Amino acid sequence: MSRCPDLCRRDNPSHSHHTTTMTTVAPTQTIPVKVLKKSSRPKDNWYYWEDVAHDLDGISLPKSVKDEILACSLEYTRTVIPHWTNRARYVAFMRIIIMGIIAEFKGDLLDVTKGDNVLNYSLDGVLSDLFTGTPDPAGMAREYKTFLLCSGDKSSGRRSGEFFRRYVNNLAHSPRRYFRMRDSDALCRFTIAVALACGDHDDVWFTNEQFDFLAELGDTMYDAVSFFKHRSEGETNSTFAYAPSDLRVAAFKQCREVLWALNAAWNDRPEMACVTSFLRYFGGPLHMMMRRYRYVEEDMTMGREEDSEIVDQTRNNYKLWNRIDASKQRDQDADSVEKKRYENIVAHGDSLLFPGLARWLEDEGEGHCDTCLYCPSYGAETTHCFGGVELCESCRPQWRDHVLSFRERAAKVFPELRPVYKRAAEDIIAPASKRTCVEATKAATENAPASPDSGVCV
């Protein structure tokens, strides 16, 4: 990921001056892009439950787009939570996903800071339908409102505001902080809680540390598969925009193996099946089954590099994707309004933000490093790059170390993994050196080129 120096600057706590208006010419395209002939979209038949068929009546979107949103909500719900016993909660989750889809590509249609009415829903009412009687309904409500707030700002004119700038600056603080924020952005712990609720497992819960680990596992796998999708979107919240992209394949392999180890460890706990099922589908098969992804359009492949046609389609919300282009101008008049909005969000952080986020935004919203590259407004400047903070050379190693330590960290959070690790059947085709996954990954990647689309097989 590279930055245009005319568009970004190092905004750090040590700088007392802040640019409020900035105009530049469009950056020069330096990477050759293969332009493909525009292809027509194949015909789709959309299916969704009657329960939600009229949920978007009166919303300012074309009927064809509404149909696609409703179908997408069904496909996601049925894929990541294939089994349910509580139908009312299941329908409530479909409505959660409908709101979430719109937040991700048409954020101007909603703003959670303006009250309980979101689209045609009572947000608190839907959340109550989903989590009443579960261990932490208030915590899950905060989790989802954080998602709506950040996703809605990212895909709207509010993206250049004070809140989103401070939010993205914090993503680059550390791997641990990033994964907690990515957890909310991907609704990972939230959907694990939903899976338990929809199966009526109201007495099953995880510690915060366990939720952190499960979310990191799911998000790492999802982001590894979605690498090129996220680049085509100019995404700010993508794991391998910060962690070394040359570890993408090895990280997926490592997480997949730990997920299967969890399946073995929980063999006598049927209530955990919905948790591992979510992580398994979220981490890969989702991209094959949902029409929101390009598996069919790309000849039944995953991991194909984006081109200018895909970026243009993303900019036009094809498949409900959203392109985050770098802003060429920051509106000085809007700055004071956005500053007040940010202050209001922080003041109501105990209901709008997950615990700890308001403090992070206040304490380190200007960034934590004097040499990482921060921006007054975030987005991708050209094709083949992400839209967030660019890490400096001294900050990069901690991300590599964090990724490579995943297997050991997993066993500390879930000690039941240790005996599973010990009794694992060794692949007889594996190298005779019998290196651990981490050792093999380190050996394979120590001198690997840091190209944005390279991968390491171990």
Which ranges hold each PLM region?
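Alpha-helical, largely C-terminal catalytic domains
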Residues: M1-V458
